[in-house]
């Protein structure tokens, strides 16, 4: 951990995602109720460095860097930074942390993302705390869309990723051996065709 680490910081985390990793910082008690802290747009997890030491330390606080922010990996080129993508990031992070229920502390844009997550996965959120967050209102059809289609899309992607077998990595020697074996077996299955046995088709 760096010498200028935030007061009370107990660990810095790196959580694997398909495009790299999500960076996060943790404070408080590992046995305490979990709280996920979400920073504002173009900010990072360090925006909570001075606030969290002032909060009750019998909670477990994790402040994450959204993708493309702070120490987290940027998205792949050409992938846009949509609000719904950040909602999906939260679902990935809490799955990696093995949290079934937790509270959200969101600042500004982070509060909007946290609110959208709460609307999409209401059974997972214990409390939603918003700091300087713009008011956002959802029509009933938008709410239904979040609870059905967008939620289903997030869960489907995560299920597909979880069911995939890990990629196999071969050494150069293994690759050459596999190629040699394939060429040998294909050569043995070749049949010699007598010359003159093939004639052009007449029109």
UniProtKB/Swiss-Prot annotation:
Top enzyme class: hydrolase
Entries under InterPro entries matching the protein: AB_hydrolase_1, AB_hydrolase_fold, AB_hydrolase_sf
Domain AB hydrolase-1 as annotated: residue spans: 33-145
Record-listed E.C. numbers: 3.1.-.-
Keyword Mitochondrion: no
SUPFAM superfamilies attached to this UniProt entry: alpha/beta-Hydrolases
Gene3D superfamilies (alphabetical): alpha/beta hydrolase
Pfam family membership, one: Abhydrolase_1
Keywords associated with the record: Hydrolase
Superkingdom as given in the UniProt entry: Eukaryota
Residues at the active site: 108
Misc. remarks from the entry: This gene may have been partially duplicated (see SERHL2).
Function in brief: Putative serine hydrolase.
Family: Belongs to the AB hydrolase superfamily.
Protein name as it appears in the record: Serine hydrolase-like protein
Organism: Homo sapiens (Human)
């Amino acid at each position: 951990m760096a010498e200028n680490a935030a007061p009370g910081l107990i660990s810095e985390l790196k959580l694997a995602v398909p495009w790299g990793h999500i960076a996060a910082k943790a404070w408080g008690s590992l046995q305490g109720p979990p709280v996920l802290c979400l920073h504002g747009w173009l900010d990072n997890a360090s925006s909570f460095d001075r606030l969290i030491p002032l909060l009750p330390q019998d909670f477990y606080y994790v402040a994450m860097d959204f993708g493309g922010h702070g120490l987290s990996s940027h998205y792949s080129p050409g992938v846009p930074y949509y609000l719904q993508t950040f909602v999906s990031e939260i679902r990935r992070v809490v799955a990696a942390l093995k949290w079934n229920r937790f509270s959200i502390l969101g600042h500004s844009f982070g509060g909007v993302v946290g609110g959208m997550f709460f609307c999409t996965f209401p059974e997972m959120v214990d409390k939603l705390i918003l700091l300087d967050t713009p008011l956002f209102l959802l029509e009933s059809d938008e709410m239904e869309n979040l609870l059905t289609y967008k939620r289903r899309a997030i869960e489907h992607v995560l299920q597909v990723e979880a069911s995939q077998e890990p990629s196999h990595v071969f050494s150069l020697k293994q690759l050459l051996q596999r190629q040699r074996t394939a060429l040998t077996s294909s050569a043995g299955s070749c049949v010699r065709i007598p010359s003159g046995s093939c004639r052009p088709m007449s029109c």
